[in-house]
A protein has these predicted regions:
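STAS-typified acidic loop motif
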Residues: 4-30
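Amphipathic alpha-helical interaction surfaces in cytosolic regulatory modules
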Residues: 22-99
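Absolute protein N-terminus
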Residues: 1-2, 102
């Protein structure tokens, strides 16, 4: 699992690579929380999941946790780039209802 990011004037795009599951969730959580805390002036955060090879319910929980933190700060969050299998997990969990797909 790896995380990279790109900042612009208005948004922070977070690129997540590899597997997002029980084994990688705690590492991903620490990386994402640090990254988000360093970029509190972003107007929006986009999670680019095009590099995800596998995601389970632990990955969904991780994204929901980041959504809640960002919602408290009034920063909208979005998802983009999910492959077919990741998209199915996201749809089944109803995640797009709180983190829209762009």
């Amino acid at each position: 699992m790896d995380v990279k990011y790109k900042k612009s004037d208005k948004s922070l795009t977070v690129y997540v690579y590899g597997e997002l599951d029980e084994c990688s969730a705690s590492v991903a959580k620490n990386i994402l929380d640090k990254l988000l805390s360093e970029n509190l002036k972003a107007k929006r955060v986009v999670f680019d999941l095009s590099g995800i090879s596998f995601m389970d319910s632990t990955g969904i929980g991780l994204l929901i946790g980041r959504y809640k933190k960002l919602k408290e700060l009034k920063i909208p969050s979005f998802i983009t780039g999910a492959n077919f299998s990741t998209e199915k997990v996201i749809e089944l969990a109803g995640l797009y209802s709180i983190m829209p797909k762009i």
